[in-house]
Design a protein with these regions (language model features):
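Transmembrane helix boundary and interhelical junction motifs in multipass membrane proteins
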Residues: 20-26, 60-68, 185-187, 224-233, ...
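Hydrophobic, membrane-inserted alpha-helices
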Residues: 21-27, 44-48, 65-70, 141-147, ...
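Transmembrane helix-boundary motif of multi-pass solute transporters/channels
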Residues: 13-76
Length: 350
């Protein structure tokens, strides 16, 4: 990409492009799970600013979609969410240090990632529909009735309990890991090279894994929102005019100021908000996320795998089980194909 003059107006417009994903999931975690709004927004803002400063490109900062969706749908505790962030931090830093992100992606082929994306989207739509149907109720009333938890901020302790730490691994982390490696690391790297040419070479898989790991370490310790980068977010920023890290600094500053100025009163305001408002927002994000799987439906085998993983994830609420079933199906489909290739080789050798 040629060096272009910085256009602040375009950068500002581009900085807002990914709020349609960031805000509904962040608000959902605050309102439905008790994540503290002040620290969450402040940390999101700081992370965005540091990300833009480091990469000098509009690299997005987004909530971990699988983790956030499962947490909202199941009423996961603040401790479990923080434990999930700490798990992701350790895993991503390990991938950055070892350089194994590319190899791990081979374990989770794109078709399985598409199936998980479909399942997450359907779970978002279902969670949004439940909230939207509570037309006359406040969000606080619905959350307490559904999960038995108070829609007030959680504590600011330094660590989750041991039980929460181990529950978070199968519930929140394992379903999230292949999405993070496939989309937040490898696909984001591809987008950076496609959109920004030589300038995008700074956005390497190892660096992306490292910044995701460090951001989630901070989130786990302070009670913030677990985050990642993402190809979709980068495309959104780029499509509306963002070309430099200035866009990240702009949206990050807005989140930082909002967290400092209004964080203390935000939880009460959200609890009083009509439940259907968040329901519609979550359903909208769910539709967009499920639509990511559409490119897998040109092939019958891939389509069946995507549908199986997505439906199992929706009906069971267990994306880890859906991932395991999808892996087993791919293995069963691969064995007959391998036998057919071997038989054709034997026939030709005679």
């Amino acid at each position: 990409m040629k060096h272009e003059p910085i256009r602040p107006v375009q950068e500002f417009i581009g900085s807002l492009a990914d709020l349609g994903t960031l805000l509904p999931l962040t608000v959902g975690l605050i309102a439905c799970n008790g994540v503290r709004p002040g620290p969450a927004l402040v940390l999101l803002g700081i992370t965005y600013i540091l990300t833009g400063t480091y990469y000098r490109l509009p690299v997005p900062v987004q909530p971990l979609k699988a983790m956030a969706t499962i947490a909202i749908a199941t009423g996961a505790s603040v401790g479990e969410i923080r434990a999930g962030a700490l798990w992701m931090s350790g895993l991503m830093i390990a991938l950055a240090v070892s350089g194994l992100a590319q190899k791990l992606n081979a374990v989770f082929p794109r078709v399985l990632i598409r199936g998980l994306q479909l399942g997450i989207g359907l779970m978002m739509i279902r969670a949004g529909a439940k909230l939207a149907l509570a037309w006359g109720d406040s969000l606080g009333t619905v959350v307490i009735g559904a999960h038995g938890v108070s829609a007030t901020p959680g504590s600011l302790g330094l660590a989750p309990s041991g039980a929460e730490f181990w529950r978070a691994l199968p519930l929140l982390v394992i379903p999230q890991l292949p999405l993070t490696v496939g989309n937040a690391v490898l696909a984001t790297r591809d987008c950076a090279l496609s959109y920004f040419g030589p300038a995008g070479e700074r956005v390497t898989p190892r660096r992306l894994a490292a910044t995701i790991g460090l951001a989630n370490l901070a989130a786990g310790l302070t009670g913030g929102v677990p985050v990642c980068h993402g190809a979709g977010g980068m495309t959104a920023h780029y499509s509306l005019g963002a070309r430099t890290g200035l866009a990240c600094a702009m949206i990050g500053s807005a989140l930082l100021v909002t967290g400092i100025a209004a964080g203390g009163s935000m939880a009460s305001a959200l609890a009083a908000m009509p439940a259907w408002v968040l329901g519609v927002l979550l359903a909208y994000v769910g539709v967009r996320h499920a639509a990511l799987a559409r490119d897998a439906f040109g092939n019958a085998t891939d389509a069946s795998t995507v549908l199986l993983v997505g439906v199992v994830g929706l009906t069971s609420g267990n994306l880890m089980a859906a991932l395991g079933i999808g892996l087993a199906l791919r293995l069963m489909l691969r064995i007959p194909a391998a036998r057919g290739v071997k038989q054709r080789f034997v026939d030709r050798s005679r």
